[in-house]
Amino acid sequence: MTSLALTTAVKRIVSAAALAMAVVVTLELAFGYGATTAIPSIVQWTCMIAAYIMGAFWWFGPWPTLGQAFAFVVIANFAIFSATITADFAPEVTLGKCAFLIPIGMLAGFFFDKWRLATHIALCLLGTTIVAVYIVVERGVDTFVAVVLWAPIVISFTGFALLLQATTQSMRLEFE
């Protein structure tokens, strides 16, 4: 993976994305938007701590192997969905927090093969759809509003990742 990037810049960007996720959850907890029952609180705290650890790993750690980077993407996907669905926010904010998937998808689109990228996209589609259904069923949001919120997020994390994948593949073919 190292031959394809300015490793320090990529590490800092991915670290900043992970740390931003952690800071958002920290602020949720500090300002009373955290989960209000025991199990969701544990989930939220676990996701926050995991995001801080992942951010520190990307900032201070060595360049990850492909397996480590893929594990990061999968764990980050689950952490984003778990922290999102357990927070006590307005429904629009709840679904909007899925936008954290965009930088994760860009990492996947640039560095991963099509199967790892497909796994990331499938997890994102599933998780974002679950969040959208949740805000309709549990929070009483109109279905149309949920779709209007859901669609740009899905298009963004899918589109950016696929565009980067296509660009990367064409660049690799040029140099073969």
Please provide the spans of the model-predicted regions.
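Central hydrophobic cores of alpha-helical transmembrane segments
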Residues: A71-N77, A118-I130
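Membrane-helix interface segments
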Residues: T65-Q68, D113-T119
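Interfacial aromatic-anchored transmembrane helix boundaries in multi-pass membrane proteins
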Residues: D88-A90, T128-V147
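Hydrophobic alpha-helical membrane segments of integral membrane proteins
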Residues: G96-F100, W115-L123
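Transmembrane alpha-helices and immediately adjacent membrane-cytoplasm interface residues
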Residues: A108-R116, A161
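Short, Lys/Arg-rich, polar N-terminal cytosolic tail immediately upstream
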Residues: M1-T7
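Hydrophobic transmembrane alpha-helices and their membrane-interface boundaries in multi-pass
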Residues: R12-E92, K97-G105
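Juxtamembrane or sensor-core-proximal signal-transducing alpha helices
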Residues: W59, V148-E176
